[in-house]
Amino acid sequence: MNDSTQAMIGWGDILTRKYAAKIATLVLAVWLHASNSMLTATTMPSAVNDIGGLNLLHWTFSIYLVGSIIAGASVGLLVVKSNIRTLMIRFALIYAFGCVVVALASNMPVVLGGRMLQGLGGGGLMGLVYIAQSRFFPSQFVPKIIACISVTWMIAAFCGPMVGGAFATWGIWRMAYWVFGVQALLLITAIHLLLPIEASNLSPKAERIPTVRLATLALAIVLMSLAGADYDRVMSPLLVFLGVMALALFVFQDRVALSSRILPKAVTNLNHPIGNGVLTIFLLCLCIMSFLIYGPTIMIKLHGVSPFTAGLVVMGETLAWSFSALIFSSTAENKEPMLIRVGSSLVVIGLIAMALTLSGRSLWMIVIATLIGSSGFGMMWGFIIKRIIINASSDEKARTSSLLPMALQLGFALGAAIAGIIANSLGLSETMNNDDIRHVAFWLFIGFVPLALLGNLFAWRFVRQDRLDSN
């Protein structure tokens, strides 16, 4: 496709009878996954008051992440055995069943079981959405579909806490999970009616799911989650190290496996665009967790803003990502490499700006700093995903597509653990004075700059290799 054709692709081309119903179905699947964490954050305190289990509260998030990543890692193999439509229905059923388990739970261990099922269902749906966008739509539509996904995450950031908070305020926190279970059933109906049955070469005798490798991956996530749960000067860094080693072992096991590979072959090849692209996503996502976790608390304590105002700043970051993705989604194809370079560079600049402004005295400068980094993400996001998938061979596209949300979530998990270690090792506490909080705020962001620069380097290498491979 030439550049002039790419430039002519607009929203009118994608929001047609042929594509709109498919997009709406995929967006509903993303909504169920994206809103889940926000919903849980506002309903679980009421659940603890009702059924106890405060000591297990942090696991309601971690266990969902474990299930989500495991399911996302598996879908690249599952689509060889079955079509996307059938698999999405199955994962939506798992998600719905998880909602029912949480809604009926009488104690926190049962809630955790339901959360694991929700994670498996949501992670599977998310992985299949990334595969579906490369199978159901022309490649030039991918940036716009990614923009739709970004907007869905934005809506989830707004609505998820409000929905969960409303049910919790009314004293019926369980009803929130019944409502999301019903939404999962609506998704099943939409999938059945609106998504096509693929005429592909399915293999009923395809390779089995590699349980040992998936167990190694699960161990890596659990170790990272433990590191961020309760800080210990010795154990927390050790757990992060062991988590990274377990992740590296998983990658090595998969690379030498004779069958049932989860990852594309090129993921460890730094001379291939897939390897550099995936590392870009992993590292840059890792680097944004400091603000999401500690930004509101620091703004409240250091700048005296209300929790509502701090929440608005965080929402502004989400808005900037989403609107940037929307605005740049119609960019001509020959401009995409530039946007990947500029966007990844803005993430680094935004991180440095956050280190300087969050520890400063101006709230508006903090807002500007958050907008810089998040706009950079939105600017590059759809294009790097599109080009990673394009650079995959035909038999690797499913593995590559399902790897992308997994890389994102692994980055979030490791970033959260590292941010917790930095904050707690510097003594962040309720009793700190403003000067000490400024010191912590500075290092919470500047400490991630080397990793962000490395991610930026991989982004530039990706563009250079992508251009060579495309010619």
Residue locations for each model-derived region?
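12-transmembrane solute porter fold
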Residues: 19-36, 40-42, 52-55, 60-63, ...
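Hydrophobic alpha-helical interface/terminus motif in multipass membrane transporters
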Residues: 44-47, 132-133, 167, 195, ...
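Helix-loop-helix hairpins in multi-pass membrane proteins, especially solute transporters
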Residues: 75-208
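Alpha-helical transmembrane segments
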Residues: 24-28, 92-93, 151, 155, ...
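Intrinsic disorder in cytosolic terminal tails and internal cytosolic loops
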Residues: 1-18, 460-471
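N-terminal membrane topogenic signal
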Residues: 13-22, 208-210
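Glycine/proline-centered helix-kink
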Residues: 41, 127, 148, 153-165, ...
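Hydrophobic transmembrane-helix bundles of small-molecule transporters
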Residues: 169-279, 287
